[in-house]
């Protein structure tokens, strides 16, 4: 009888603790993962809307007030500076296509692998229109703070970009794996 009571007590305790939910550490990991998924969804949404032509999406709802875009000419700080920086893609290119090929993250960091295509029909960061097609892939490192974009830094092959925009005719190397023709 005592053995049976011990068994029932043991089973009751096992059942009680197994139903109590995740530990504090497990819950923190679940919360962090849920926040990351929410941040990734927001990030993709913002850039899809922007490249659909809704430049008003670059605002303080999605970007921190002191958002930073790191460039080789110095950091750009603030929502308006970021919006003006990315507007160069609209001013410099027609038939623009921006694709987020992949995006993933960990904690408050996101990595975006992207592709940009367009026809160079306007001034692009001081490079006059050439009429050339651009097909450029790159990666962006992103920091998120309190559910908002707080920092971006793009990495791409600048030589490929310049070759494509300044080439007068013939073959252009888009990247090491693909050939483009003007």
Regions picked out by a protein language model, each given a short descriptive name:
Residues 19-61, 172-182:
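Short, low-complexity N-terminal intrinsically disordered segments enriched in polar/charged residues
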Residues 1-9:
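Bacterial N-terminal signal peptides that target proteins for export
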Residues 43, 58-60, 66-67, 78, ...:
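Hydrophobic pocket/interface hotspot
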Residues 150-182:
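Low-complexity, intrinsically disordered terminal/linker segments enriched in charged
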Residues 117-146:
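Exposed beta-sheet edge and beta->alpha loop/turn motif
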Residues 108-120:
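A short hydrophobic beta-strand element
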Residues 56-107:
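A solvent-exposed, acidic/Ser-Thr-rich amphipathic alpha-helical stretch
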Residues 8-17:
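Bacterial N-terminal signal peptides
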């Amino acid at each position: 009888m005592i053995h049976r009571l011990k068994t029932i007590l043991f089973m009751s305790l096992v059942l009680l603790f197994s139903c109590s939910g995740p530990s504090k550490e497990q819950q923190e990991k679940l919360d962090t993962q849920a926040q990351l998924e929410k941040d990734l969804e927001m990030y993709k949404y913002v850039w899809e809307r922007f490249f659909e032509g809704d430049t008003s999406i670059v605002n303080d709802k999605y970007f921190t007030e002191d958002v930073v875009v790191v460039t080789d000419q110095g950091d750009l700080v603030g929502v308006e500076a970021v919006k003006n920086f990315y507007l160069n893609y609209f001013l410099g290119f027609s038939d623009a296509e921006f694709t987020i090929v992949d995006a993933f993250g960990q904690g408050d960091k996101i990595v975006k692998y992207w592709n940009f295509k367009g026809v160079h029909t306007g001034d692009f960061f001081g490079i006059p229109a050439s009429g050339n097609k651009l097909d450029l892939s790159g990666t962006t490192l992103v920091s998120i703070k309190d559910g908002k974009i707080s920092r971006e830094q793009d990495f791409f092959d600048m030589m490929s970009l310049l070759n494509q925009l300044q080439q007068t005719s013939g073959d252009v190397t888009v990247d090491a794996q693909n050939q483009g023709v003007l």
